Amino acid sequence: MLLLCGLLPCFCWAQHRSITDAESIVEKFVLTHPKISKGNNIKYHPLSKDKSIETNQEHQPYYIFSDDAERTGFVIISGDERMPEILAYSEDNSFNVDNIPPNVQYWLDCYAEAFSRLSPAASTNRQSVSLSTTHEVQPLLEGNSWGQGDPYNRLCPSYNNERCVTGCVATAMAQVMAHYRYPAIGKGSVDYRTLTNNIHVTRDFSKDEFLWGDMLENYKTHFTEIQAKAVSELMFSCGASVKMDYGTSSQGGSGAYQTSLVTAYINNFSYDRDMACLFRNHCSTEDWHAILMHELDEGRPVNYAGQSLRDGGHSFVLDGYKTSTNSNYPDYHVNWGWNGTCNGYYQIANLAPAEDGQQHTADGFNSSQQMVVGTMPEDGIDNHFRFLCTSNLHTSSSKVKNGSTIQVYTASLVNSSYKETNGTIAVTLTNSEDTTETIIADTYLKSLGYQQEQRNYSLNITIPSNIKEGQYQVELRYHHTGTNDYQKVFSQQYPVITISDSGEDNPTDDYYAYLGCSDFELASTTGDSIICIKLYELQNLIEDPFIGDIRMILANNQGKALTVFGDSIQPDEMGMHEIVEEPLSIQGCLTGDWENGKYRIYIGARRINQQSYTNISFYDITIPQGEYKDFYFEADIVDGKMMIDGKTFPIIPSIIQDTSYHLTNTANNVIYSLTGTRQSSLRRGINIIRGKDGRMCKIFKKNK
């Protein structure tokens, strides 16, 4: 939930809040919320050390105040003045610090992580945009206090004589369906085995008749067997539809992917086909809140999810909002799906903005948040809208001349909607002074299905020669075939370029790729043409994000590059100083006729707009900070074979003109053929030089 916070511009010295400061804030807050203080028993409850993320700070990231006597009302105060004062509150529900639901603990972890990322710098002088509103939406699920245990899980499978819990995704889904009391009956079926416990799950949804009238808003006290059966039937159907990986409470519960909700709602329960599942790191703060508020304004509860640092993903429902007294973004009402515990209003705005006022996402919380939009019964109307999203959008130049050409690119263009795309992509330039919008570079977009992406997407655009000088925000637009509208393609940030008649083109600063790794090794075996190199802890060493590819480079003994070879690896976009935790393997075969001698093999990285590859550096704690050195393997080529670290790799010879080549398996059966007139085919075919039995395929030539 580290989104851009709606703080007013201010000039002050930053300081942490003490418990005394927090108590003073609570005293003022309850004066305007009398239901919280009616028992006069609201007090501070410290958390045990294992309940929050280690912040390495003397002060608390937040302070929890609750009314234990009346069991009504709580307030959570932030631990730093740069965060909103009130992080969460409720006038109706309790907050037991000794029994915090996992979903709520996730939220508290996010608050603590935001607190830990606050710079000790004193100045909080910055200005941020806001999305203020005077409108409110009362909780749409008001009264619903469902959970994951009994009686909700009575039809869930058992494991080791213990009944599995429903799972937070299923409970949240059931709550939304209960809001609509729809459908009357399901459709389709499912048959699968769970990943963790290998439990066989089967369900024929066409036989499900949902008895909405028999379901209670809560099952805390008395209920009949009929009422219990009605809600447990719904819960199991929801879980099976998202292919729930069922587990017991002692195992940590049951889990499912949030993205599965969209297909389950539509395919098994006849919900609207215009639904979508959006990721937080694909939207700006303003867009994210605008979409979320619009859904709630339309009376549609929102299935929301986040990723915990300690125990995986969590799903719950946002079902209302009201104006915040201490933030320019609303307080959202959260139903945690935990028998009503801790339900209340919570801040989901950026709790720890960067010192420059900009929005950063290296923390990972933004990227882990998701929401399902458009959830409602099928209305039979195709609105032709597609939620197309990108990771960060970039331009190759920040200052350009009229009539010049630049590139607009992103690491990934994703279709977040259930319906596939069918149309074109355009670039718009919006003047920051008079909001004049110019549409250019309308190009075809290949069809993308639900959650499908096009990697390393780029467009070359020519700046109109007659466009007015000034600053322009660059955005993408999607034009659906058969419509007249250009729909916004969402991005977490939109680049700004300066256009002038006489100015020189200014490529983006430090445009070359600068990557490093902590260690590397040769992972291949001798006798195989395929060279495989593993990189450990690959890191982007500069502030600019890395979007591009990585390949092997053959150089002479002085380090001059001779050729690139092998697979082109395209890692996910790497943010400022981001580290890839998993080892990265790069492999391929060297082709050609090379003279005997000494050579080097480097690993090179190339950003999407970069013409040549930059050697990846080797960094280690023994090397002074800011100093890096290239790494490479020394290699010897002798009679068509390359020797690296005592291992031998046959080199695939160059294609000779007017010669046919065939790749064969060990039985000498031809499995691929190529000619000397199509050298590129050899490279495309490199990955099939292994036979089905895994052995090296033979290569022979035959004169025409």
Segments predicted by a language model, with ranges:
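Short beta-strand elements
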Residues: G482-S518, N609-I652
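Contiguous beta-strand segments within globular domains
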Residues: H394-T424, Q454-N460, E521-D549, P583-S585
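Noncatalytic regulatory segments and standalone regulatory/sensor domains
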Residues: S18, A22, V26, V30, ...
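Active-site-adjacent substructure of cysteine-protease-like catalytic cores
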Residues: K43, S48-R71, T263, N267-N335, ...
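C-terminal outer-membrane/trafficking sorting elements
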Residues: C10-F11, I652-K704
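Active-site-adjacent structural segments surrounding the nucleophilic cysteine of cysteine proteases
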Residues: I86-G253
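Residue-level detector of functionally pivotal "anchor" positions at catalytic/ligand-binding pockets or at interdomain
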Residues: S367-T390, T508, P650-R678
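Bacterial Sec-dependent N-terminal signal peptides
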Residues: M1-I19, K243, Y265
